[in-house]
Amino acid sequence: MLEARDLYCERDERTLFRGLSFTVDAGEWVQVTGGNGAGKTTLLRLLTGLARPDGGEVYWQGEPLRRVRDSFHRSLLWIGHQPGIKTRLTARENLHFFHPGDGARLPEALAQAGLAGFEDVPVARLSAGQQRRVALARLWLTRAALWVLDEPFTAIDVNGVARLTRRMAAHTAQGGMVILTTHQPLPGAADTVRRLALTGGGAGL
């Protein structure tokens, strides 16, 4: 379980959120919503331990995140707004970098992400959407329980969004957890996703 307790965050003398508390249990996914500058990416960075809140605490499995960073990061898949891939490597080589023990599974993961036939193309030659798919192919390889995804559908077409949404639904059905930001609808998942709305100084579930 991931828990946020009474989080407070300020940026440039402006309160993004205060008194923000919620939990994400096994089998749940949460969509963080809010306007530009509401603090969506900032919240994800706090939840992953990439930044510290100005007040409050994040807990993982009942322990303060700052005390269990190693075990937490073994359980975490974080894909930020930037793909975080190496453009001089091929799609296959990028996945191998993150998942060196899964060589036999890489082609299937890339195919699931819509990159069949592009496995050995240097990422620098791929479109923005294809580069995003290289990063998202990790969803078919990772064993992490918690997925935190910042705008995963950027530059992804409708069919790709549907495929990725099904993968997230399968992950939560198996007891995984997903937290994501997106402005796009989640096809077929509207009834199962909790929404956390950041409203500037507060939030509502």
Curated annotation (Swiss-Prot):
Binding residues annotated for ATP, in chain numbering: 34-41
Localization: Cell inner membrane
Entry-linked InterPro entries: AAA+_ATPase (IPR003593), ABC_transporter-like_ATP-bd (IPR003439), ABC_transporter-like_CS (IPR017871), ABC_transptr_haem_export_CcmA (IPR005895), P-loop_NTPase (IPR027417)
Residue intervals of the ABC transporter domain: 2-205
CDD domains for the chain: ABC_CcmA_heme_exporter
Major localization class: membrane
GO BP, sorted A to Z: cytochrome complex assembly
Reactions that this protein is recorded to catalyse: heme b(in) + ATP + H2O = heme b(out) + ADP + phosphate + H(+)
Membrane topology summary: Peripheral membrane protein
Domain of life: Bacteria
Enzyme Commission number: 7.6.2.5
A Pfam short name: ABC_tran
GO cellular component: plasma membrane
Function, as annotated: Part of the ABC transporter complex CcmAB involved in the biogenesis of c-type cytochromes; once thought to export heme, this seems not to be the case, but its exact role is uncertain. Responsible for energy coupling to the transport system.
Family to which the UniProt record says this protein belongs: Belongs to the ABC transporter superfamily. CcmA exporter (TC 3.A.1.107) family.
UniProt xrefs under NCBIfam families: ccmA (TIGR01189), PRK13538.1 (NF010061)
Protein's name in the database: Cytochrome c biogenesis ATP-binding export protein CcmA 1
